[in-house]
């Protein structure tokens, strides 16, 4: 999909709407407010809808003729979950990309190295995971979050939220923005079986599957590893393999 046209249109429309508001608010206030409101909606939609490509390309699947999926695991590394998840991945002969947080990678270097040593991939999920504010960061802070994260060809924004400064920053670094096809909502749901069932219901060949690690509670210290185990069992029973896709 060509994304440069909607990007330029949205920014151009926002500028025109601001000028229209300035010149028309006194004579046609409702019309001026309506145009300004529409311009804000056009900016917010690709910002807050994770897989929307209007600001630039978002990888949401990969091409394959086989029953293969790309498993991605966000928010690690974690000293408890990462070793357990690596053991589960090995048992199911599955590969995964771990989108790690830079500060956690620096805090847990052994777990980060264990991911790589097991043949999995490490990707950038910002330095601090500012999920509530990243989408409104200016260019300098976005660049800082990317640069202090791990070196990788792939980047995933916190909660998938991104503004129009993200793609230029990634392009300058030769990186791609990765979204997802299906997620298990494992930071919301409380039942690992429900997480696995949701993924299996929506998965298709070439899907990007999103799971998490590191969100531990006293009642469910192994919740995310359990989600991974049940998800891999369900995918295996459905004859899916978890692979690392090549470059696009």
Feature-to-residue mapping (PLM):
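Active-site beta->alpha N-cap acidic-glycine motif
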Residues: 43-134, 168, 172, 185, ...
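Divalent metal-coordination and catalytic microenvironments
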Residues: 74, 89, 98, 122, ...
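A structural signal for short, hydrophobic/glycine-enriched beta-strand patches
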Residues: 126-128, 139, 158
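Short beta-strands and strand-loop turn motifs
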Residues: 123-127, 179-181, 208-214
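An active-site-proximal "capping" alpha-helix that borders the catalytic cofactor pocket
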Residues: 139-152
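Catalytic grooves of carbohydrate-active enzymes
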Residues: 199-247
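His/Asp/Glu-enriched short active-site or ligand-binding loop at hydrolase and phosphoryl-transfer sites
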Residues: 161, 166-202, 240-248
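N-terminal pre-catalytic segment of deacetylase/amide-hydrolase enzymes
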Residues: 1-71, 79-91, 230-248
